Amino acid sequence: MATQTVENGARSGPRRTTVGDLLKPLNSEYGKVAPGWGTTPLMGVAMALFAVFLSIILEIYNSSVLLDGISMN
């Protein structure tokens, strides 16, 4: 037979590791939600600043914004 059976006594539980012990407190907050809006406004500001950054990079790439002293091929 190709399948192998394992007796209940031979099965081992999950191994404990140092990294797992360090990360366990982070997982204990799973499922908990802060009341209200939380950090949503901060995320909105970060997204807006990132959009401005991307638009500036795009304008430089398209040579819409000319920079003094920098030659573009």
UniProtKB/Swiss-Prot annotation:
It comes from the Eukaryota. One of its GO terms (cellular component) is chloroplast thylakoid membrane. It is a single-pass membrane protein. Phosphorylation is a light-dependent reaction catalyzed by a membrane-bound kinase; phosphorylation occurs on Thr residue(s) in the N-terminus of the protein. Residues 1-21 are annotated as: Disordered. GO terms for molecular function: phosphate ion binding. InterPro entries: PSII_PsbH, PSII_PsbH_sf. NCBIfam families: PRK02624.1. One of the components of the core complex of photosystem II (PSII), required for its stability and/or assembly. PSII is a light-driven water:plastoquinone oxidoreductase that uses light energy to abstract electrons from H(2)O, generating O(2) and a proton gradient subsequently used for ATP formation. It consists of a core antenna complex that captures photons, and an electron transfer chain that converts photonic excitation into a charge separation. Belongs to the PsbH family. This is Photosystem II reaction center protein H. It comes from Lactuca sativa. The gene is psbH.
